């Protein structure tokens, strides 16, 4: 049986988060192995170091999120200050998957996965190199200071540009995601998240990981730059938005420099820039990988809708962002920029952002603005998260690198290396470069010959072979017909289902799906609905009716986004619509085959299928799908009238909405209420949904409409003040756009700063001199009880005389507090031993215990010296020395 370790690093904030209904238990059960709960401090330690992920590590109590944990310096221990009611229900999740337990065995009913057939070849192939030779160079400018980031952020980049290309050229900017920042060139196991890197460690060159795509684009006439964001990665764990605003500011600082260098300041540009053609700042494409995807999306929003307050960038916007490419992106805020076209890569074997939450860059744009901008999703069968960046790829990277698709207890039938469905690193990077180039051709060159590769038309780019890349889209020249809502009617084998709900009867199902990813603090999101189809005999029709008749005039085809379970055989449906005169018109049949999947994948993804629309349909009142198979299930995401080509995208004057962070001192007594402001720009009617907790810590979601002239919503947060010491407490607020609004800062909070002095700590020996087999003990006493755990960590120091070794103490105790085996015997001060001790809230004392064991070896007196330092609060500490006499 695999053992886990119980170590932790203290955080400084208690997060008070929405809780879902749970039955009360008379006595809270104990947490599972690997967990430790001391009052309001929760810690979990992985069996081995876990490189930082873009998705982050979250602690959950059943279905209630407690918050995002912070990693320790050794990348093994994760900590959160929160108060679980049921420690036995604690879970570690990242992008929806469990990290603290072995994954379940695949269900016996899940069919064997098969590689999808190659799609027909498209007329255009953007993966072919262009006519230009390329040049490569780098620049390093003075670092910048950003709010919330203590250390300056580097302004480093690699430039790949075409040689001898005439005139100004479109600019493509790449931003990498969250990765470890430093590594040792002599010890492959030594990595870290510091910035700047300490002595002996080297910065990871993540920004050099997109050279293959940059070289392809440069050969086709685009100037490209890939920027470094190590300074953001090392510090974004302390920010409320996981670094989205900081990444946006970094991008905009670089764009400002490029705008300067394209104009009067060209003579002072770095050599790598001067050797490139001037950039055409009216044609900019942003490419973001992982958290970099969320960062460039925020940069697009900040460029169209300037952010309030100090974001570290205040200059004019001298560029036009024509599109975003988002590679395996995070979107914690569910806040896409609806008026900037986008293409989102969804890697089928993503082991980091494994819930494929980037789907929200498509789905969450519906109904928010005019719907003219194309938003495309590309499902890449067999692609993982890391290999789009060569500096995160084993065998290519300068620093240590790994396959992010975790191996699990048994090989995955789809994603294990060597399977027919898994791409190699080179295949994945080639496919990625090809579809980035397709996006550049479409958004920057307005070359619509590549549009069928991105808009669900079911064709492929030969340069990306053998990759299977499927696409669907919203926006462009589409007219919404069925976009499920609470007003939608469904009958027959169909029902309206909630994408986000704690009610199994109302929910769309428990299967992992990119379309069902929920907003972080939401127990329900009423605006997010789908149509669930389930039939037990061929011909059981599903009928779906929008709230009002919809005109399909001018549309050439009806496009449906339809998902069937992973590995399902080809599932055929006869499609018809009913017009306002009651006439049913048969449109033809569509067929959808399940994507290759296992229980570990988010493969319930909607594929786009189309049927011709005859002339004269006019207004349609109902959509009917009649399955031809004997039984089955499907999920209809939406249906649109479709015509080929794009329509002009004129950004709407959307109101920008931002949740703010309000900081207050706690106070001394009574029930206190403070407001968290949610600010809004714009003068039209704007609708958003808020998420927060009420006075009983019950989750609240509220639909809010801001009328013309209204620019603020106050969210009341109530707490009880006292004179006992405790950590500062964060009460979060979330906001999601519903109509005529774009969200900048999706997360705000009331930060209640504790203003009480910490209790005084005294330490007294209980048994600091024992014989072998005895237990060394010290008692820690506080001058008064606190509201929160009083936490310290102790490290062993060499005592200067005979020192206790790993075999002089209890082996299980040593393993639980170090993660190391006791053999071979070695001094305690040479190990990773950490003794964490917490005085729980409401109590005033606790003992530190070091259990020793007897042995047959004749020894003199041995000692252990422990140095304790406060983690919460900081600034306290002490040293103790224990003596152990030989039993012989």
Which residues does each predicted region cover?
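Secretory targeting and sorting signals
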Residues: 1-24
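Short conserved active-site loop signatures built around small residues
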Residues: 25-174, 181
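Alpha/beta-hydrolase-fold serine-hydrolase catalytic core, especially in secreted/extracellular enzymes
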Residues: 25-37, 51-53, 60-65, 71, ...
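Short, surface-exposed "cap/lid" segments of acyl-processing enzymes
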Residues: 163-222
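Gly/Ser-rich "nucleophile elbow"/oxyanion-hole loop immediately N-terminal to the catalytic nucleophile
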Residues: 164-167, 238-288
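Active-site-adjacent alpha-helix of alpha/beta-hydrolase-fold enzymes
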Residues: 340-416, 425
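Extracellular carbohydrate recognition and processing domains
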Residues: 582-619, 629-632, 708-709
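Short boundary segments that mark the start of a structured unit
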Residues: 649-888
């Amino acid at each position: 049986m695999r053992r886990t370790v119980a170590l932790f690093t203290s955080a400084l904030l208690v997060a008070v988060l929405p809780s879902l209904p749970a039955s009360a238990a008379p006595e809270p059960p104990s947490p599972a192995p690997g967990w430790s709960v001391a009052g309001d401090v929760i810690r979990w330690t992985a069996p081995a170091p876990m490189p930082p992920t873009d998705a982050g590590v979250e602690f959950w109590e059943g279905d209630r999120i407690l918050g995002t944990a912070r990693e320790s310096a050794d990348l093994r221990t994760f900590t959160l200050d929160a108060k679980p009611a049921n420690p036995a229900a604690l879970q570690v999740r990242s992008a929806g998957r469990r990290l603290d337990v072995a994954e379940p065995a695949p269900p016996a009913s899940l069919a064997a996965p098969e590689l999808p057939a190659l799609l027909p070849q498209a007329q255009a192939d953007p993966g072919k190199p262009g006519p230009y030779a390329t040049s490569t160079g780098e620049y390093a400018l003075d670092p910048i200071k950003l709010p919330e980031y203590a250390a300056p952020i580097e302004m480093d980049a690699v430039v790949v540009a075409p040689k001898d290309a005439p005139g100004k050229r479109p600019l493509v900017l790449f931003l990498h995601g969250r990765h470890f920042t430093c590594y040792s060139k002599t010890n492959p196991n030594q990595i870290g998240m510091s910035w700047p890197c300490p002595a002996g460690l080297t910065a990871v060159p993540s920004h050099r990981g997109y050279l293959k795509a940059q070289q392809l684009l440069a050969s086709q006439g685009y100037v490209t730059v890939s920027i470094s964001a190590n300074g953001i990665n090392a510090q974004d764990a302390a920010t409320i938005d996981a670094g989205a605003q900081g990444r946006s500011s970094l991008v905009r600082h670089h764009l400002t420099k490029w705008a300067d260098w394209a104009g009067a300041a060209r003579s002072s540009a770095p050599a790598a820039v001067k050797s490139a053609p001037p950039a055409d700042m009216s044609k900019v494409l942003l490419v973001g990988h992982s958290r970099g995807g969320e960062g460039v999306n925020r940069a697009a929003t900040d460029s169209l809708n300037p952010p309030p307050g100090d974001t570290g960038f205040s200059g004019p916007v001298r560029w036009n962002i024509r599109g975003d490419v988002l590679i395996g992106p995070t979107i914690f805020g569910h806040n896409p920029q609806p008026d900037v076209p986008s293409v989102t890569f969804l890697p089928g074997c993503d082991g980091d952002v494994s819930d494929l939450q980037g789907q929200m860059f498509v789905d969450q744009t519906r109904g928010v603005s005019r719907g003219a901008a194309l938003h495309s999703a590309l499902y890449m069968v067999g692609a993982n998260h890391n290999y789009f960046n060569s500096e995160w790829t084993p065998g290519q990277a300068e620093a240590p690198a790994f396959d992010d698709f975790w191996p699990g207890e048994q090989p995955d039938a789809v994603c294990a290396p060597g399977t027919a469905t898994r791409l190699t690193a080179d295949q994945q990077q080639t496919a990625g470069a090809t579809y980035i180039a397709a996006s550049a051709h479409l958004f920057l060159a307005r070359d619509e010959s590549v549009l069928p590769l991105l808009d669900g038309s079911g064709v492929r780019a030969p340069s990306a072979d053998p990759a299977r890349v499927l696409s669907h889209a919203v926006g462009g020249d589409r007219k919404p017909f069925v976009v499920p809502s609470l007003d939608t009617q469904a009958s027959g084998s169909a029902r309206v289902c909630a994408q986000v709900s704690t009610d199994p009867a109302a929910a769309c199902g428990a299967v992992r799906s990119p379309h069902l990813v929920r907003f972080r603090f939401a127990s329900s999101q009423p605006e997010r609905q789908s149509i669930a189809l389930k039939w037990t005999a061929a011909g059981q029709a599903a009928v779906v009716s929008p709230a009002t008749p919809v005109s399909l005039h001018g549309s050439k085809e009806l496009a449906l986004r339809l998902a069937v379970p992973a590995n399902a055989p080809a599932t055929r449906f006869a499609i018809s619509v009913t017009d306002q005169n009651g006439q049913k018109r048969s449109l033809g049949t569509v067929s959808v085959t399940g994507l290759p999947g296992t229980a570990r994948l988010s493969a319930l993804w909607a594929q786009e299928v189309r049927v011709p629309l005859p002339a004269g349909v006019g207004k349609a009142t109902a959509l009917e799908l009649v399955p031809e198979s004997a039984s089955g299930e499907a999920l209809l995401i939406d249906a649109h009238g479709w015509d080929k080509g794009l329509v002009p995208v004129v950004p709407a004057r959307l109101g920008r909405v931002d949740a703010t962070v309000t900081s207050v001192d706690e106070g001394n007594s009574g029930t206190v209420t403070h407001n968290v402001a949610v600010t809004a720009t714009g003068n039209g009617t704007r609708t958003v949904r808020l998420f927060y907790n009420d006075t009983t810590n019950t989750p609240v979601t509220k639909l809010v409409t801001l009328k013309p002239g209204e620019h603020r919503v106050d969210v009341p947060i109530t707490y009880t003040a006292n004179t006992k010491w405790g950590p500062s407490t964060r009460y979060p607020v979330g906001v999601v756009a519903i109509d005529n609004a774009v969200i900048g800062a999706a997360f705000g909070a009331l930060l209640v700063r504790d203003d009480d002095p910490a209790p005084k700590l005294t330490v007294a020996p209980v048994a600091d001199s024992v014989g072998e087999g005895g237990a060394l003990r010290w008692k820690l006493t506080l001058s008064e009880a606190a509201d929160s755990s009083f936490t310290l960590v102790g490290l062993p120091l060499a005592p200067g005389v005979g020192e206790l070794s790993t075999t002089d103490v209890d082996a299980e105790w040593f393993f639980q507090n170090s993660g190391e085996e006791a053999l071979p015997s070695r001094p305690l001060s040479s190990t990773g031993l950490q003794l964490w001790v917490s005085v729980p809230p409401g109590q005033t004392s606790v003992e530190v215990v070091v259990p020793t064991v007897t042995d047959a070896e004749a020894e003199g007196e041995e000692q252990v010296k422990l140095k304790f330092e406060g983690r919460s609060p900081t600034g306290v500490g002490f040293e103790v020395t224990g003596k152990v006499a030989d039993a012989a």
